[in-house]
């Protein structure tokens, strides 16, 4: 997971006014899969649509003309060459000079990234990744977003994304992301860079071995079954349910047991630790979209009731994690340990137990950072995936019918197993397509730590870069019917879509060396939950429920929840066919025919 980014300024574009969300300043109507109100779109006269299309074509033509005329071309000064020659004459080695001046190239012209300028008010009424899509359609796969002295590079080109995330990943850090998350994740795997990241990745990745993932399938099934019990009660009473909060509690219960063997039991209880976790989660999300980092003001931490609550919540969580680490250490010391590649303690198969049993020599503070990182990353993203998957399913009954047919055939009335994961192909494609339309997160953040060339554009170190996964996943250049929810766009007998076989136009879990290490864990978690809920219930948008709208946070949330009605499925009875026999058939012949 990566968090959405803070905004200090934003570009000037035309947007319609919408109602502000209490969760965030960045909101967009999302009653359809493309984040717009379909009723509003359908009400626009064809003549107006044609006019808008003509205006858009005119803007793009003007941009092409400006590029052709050299408006985005910078003529390089001969000054760097003069300096380089002078330094050479006084004995500076040529390899040092080449390194110092390589990014500046020769005295030839070089292209300048197209630039969009503006003010913060222009897009405060929309989730930020929506205006980025509109700008992408105008400016192309890479452009600079400039406001005052600050600028960002927006990347929506798969080849450039691949270069940043994979081919030259060593030249990029997490940048702003690490600064935002330091208060809660410290030097955990997601915000960490350099040698700390390499060491922690080497320690944690082996914990996610095949035996562990297979054991987690049972955990996913048990937790999903507890959610089904709550839905059974709601269906019996005819009550509507708010699924986003339930999915959040489901994934919190799963990640607590999977990572550090702690039973939050949040589907049935509310405790101080659960409240503390949600306080910290909301703070992390709010910081990711706040235009002013007031939390960095020393006195603010003391006078702000909210910041005092965050500090208290963090202390409670850290104390709880310290207790869990101490308990697990005692358990490891007492067991007759024969550690091996797929080691797993049957009583406590958690990642924490694996790390301690492996002899991972780190401080309790580093362990806490790792556990907190996995808690946040593994909780919010999966909850968001399930929320938008079930929203999409309410819009396509034909997809639900195919989904139920597969689930009935593969798992029937039992819990799924690791062997079923390969058989639930259509269920997996539903999840794949949900992640395409609603990527979690919608933007990946990087900062250049070396000079580089993106496409044809030279960039300097220190550039903040936003890779728009939303744009990549909805680009009409790479997807047919890009806005349509169509799980069958990938053949069921083909490979599971990922960044490699989709040429980085599809980044559900990022890509390159910093790709999410829990991609298989998260995929199976989502598939199990979808299968178990769909086999038992039918879901529809609740009568009178507010339109589903998006808001920006660490992931894509709804503004007012996903309110659905739940009804228990009634499967057709499987009545065996009875052969028609003559009236004078004997009893023995009847028994033989029915046996």
Swiss-Prot record:
Changing residue 283 to K: In lut5-2; decreased activity. GO terms for cellular component: chloroplast; chloroplast envelope. InterPro entries: Cyt_P450 (IPR001128), Cyt_P450_CS (IPR017972), Cyt_P450_E_grp-I (IPR002401), Cyt_P450_sf (IPR036396), Cytochrome_P450_Monoox (IPR050196). GO terms for biological process: carotenoid biosynthetic process; xanthophyll biosynthetic process. Signal peptide: none annotated. Its EC number is 1.14.-.-. GO terms for molecular function: beta-carotene 3-hydroxylase activity; heme binding; iron ion binding; oxidoreductase activity, acting on paired donors, with incorporation or reduction of molecular oxygen. It is found in: Plastid, Chloroplast. Residues 1-28 form a transit peptide. It holds the Pfam family p450. Its cofactor is heme. Keywords: Carotenoid biosynthesis, Chloroplast, Heme, Iron, Metal-binding, Monooxygenase, Oxidoreductase, Plastid, Transit peptide. CDD domains: CYP97. Disruption phenotype: Accumulation of alpha-carotene and alpha-cryptoxanthin. Triple mutant cyp97a3, bch1 and bch2 has a highly retarded growth. Its main location: plastid. Heme binds at residue 516. Heme-containing cytochrome P450 involved in the biosynthesis of xanthophylls. Specific for beta-ring hydroxylation of alpha- and beta-carotene. Also has a low activity toward the epsilon-rings of alpha-carotene. The beta-ring of alpha-carotene is the preferred substrate in planta. PANTHER family: CYTOCHROME P450 FAMILY 4 (PTHR24291), PROTEIN LUTEIN DEFICIENT 5, CHLOROPLASTIC (PTHR24291:SF171). Alpha-carotene is incorporated into photosystems in lut5 mutants. Belongs to the cytochrome P450 family. This is Protein LUTEIN DEFICIENT 5, chloroplastic. It comes from Arabidopsis thaliana (Mouse-ear cress).
């Amino acid at each position: 997971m990566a968090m959405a980014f803070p905004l200090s300024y934003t570009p000037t574009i035309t947007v319609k006014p919408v109602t502000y969300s209490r969760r965030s300043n960045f909101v967009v109507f999302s009653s359809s899969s493309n984040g717009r109100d379909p009723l509003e779109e359908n009400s626009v006269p064809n003549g107006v649509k044609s006019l808008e299309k003509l205006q858009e074509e005119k803007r793009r033509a003007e941009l092409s003309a400006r590029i052709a005329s050299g408006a985005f071309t910078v003529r390089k000064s001969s000054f760097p060459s003069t300096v380089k020659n002078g330094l050479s004459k006084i004995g500076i080695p040529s390899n040092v000079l080449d390194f110092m001046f390589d990014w500046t190239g020769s005295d030839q012209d070089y292209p300048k990234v197209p630039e969009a300028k503006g003010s913060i008010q222009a897009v405060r009424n929309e989730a930020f990744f929506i205006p980025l899509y509109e700008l992408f359609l105008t400016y192309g796969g890479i452009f600079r977003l400039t406001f005052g002295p600050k600028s960002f590079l927006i990347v929506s080109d798969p080849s450039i994304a691949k270069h940043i995330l994979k081919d030259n990943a060593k030249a990029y850090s997490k940048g702003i992301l690490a600064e935002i998350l330091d208060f809660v994740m410290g030097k955990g795997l997601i915000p960490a860079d350099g040698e700390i990241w390499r060491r922690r990745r080497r320690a944690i990745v082996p914990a996610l071995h095949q035996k562990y993932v297979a054991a987690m399938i049972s955990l996913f099934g048990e937790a999903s079954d507890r959610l089904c019990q709550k839905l059974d009660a709601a269906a019996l009473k005819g009550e509507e349910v708010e699924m986003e909060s339930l999915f959040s509690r489901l994934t919190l219960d799963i990640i607590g047991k999977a990572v550090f063997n702690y039973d939050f039991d949040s589907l049935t209880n509310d405790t101080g630790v659960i409240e503390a976790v949600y306080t910290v989660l909301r703070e992390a999300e709010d910081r990711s979209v706040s235009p002013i980092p007031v939390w960095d003001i020393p006195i603010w931490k003391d006078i702000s009731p909210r910041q005092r609550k965050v500090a208290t919540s963090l202390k409670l969580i850290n104390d709880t994690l310290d207790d869990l680490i101490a308990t697990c250490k005692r358990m490891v010391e007492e067991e007759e340990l024969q550690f091996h590649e797929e080691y797993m303690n049957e009583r406590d198969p958690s990642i924490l137990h694996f790390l301690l049993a492996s002899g991972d020599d780190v401080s309790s503070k580093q362990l806490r950072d790792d556990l907190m990182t996995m808690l946040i990353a593994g909780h919010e993203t999966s909850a968001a995936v399930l929320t938008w998957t079930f929203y999409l399913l309410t819009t396509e009954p034909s997809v639900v019918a195919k989904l139920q047919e597969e689930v009935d055939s593969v798992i029937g009335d039992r819990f799924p197993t690791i062997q079923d994961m390969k058989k639930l192909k259509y269920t997996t494609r539903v999840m794949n397509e949900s992640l395409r339309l609603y990527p979690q997160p919608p933007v990946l953040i990087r900062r250049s730590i070396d000079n580089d060339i993106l496409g044809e554009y030279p960039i300097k170190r220190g550039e903040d870069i936003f890779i728009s996964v939303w744009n990549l996943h909805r680009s009409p250049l790479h997807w047919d019917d890009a806005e349509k929810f169509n799980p069958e766009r990938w053949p069921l007998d083909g490979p599971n879509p990922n960044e490699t076989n989709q040429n980085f136009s599809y980044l559900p879990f990022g890509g390159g060396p910093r790709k999410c290490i829990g991609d298989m864990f998260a995929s199976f978690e989502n598939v199990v939950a979808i299968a178990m809920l769909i086999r038992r219930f039918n879901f529809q948008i609740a009568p009178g429920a507010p339109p589903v709208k998006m808001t920006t946070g660490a992931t894509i949330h709804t503004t007012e929840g996903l309110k659905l009605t739940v009804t228990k499925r009634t499967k057709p009875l499987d009545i065996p066919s009875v052969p028609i026999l003559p009236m004078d058939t004997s009893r023995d012949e009847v028994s033989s025919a029915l046996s």
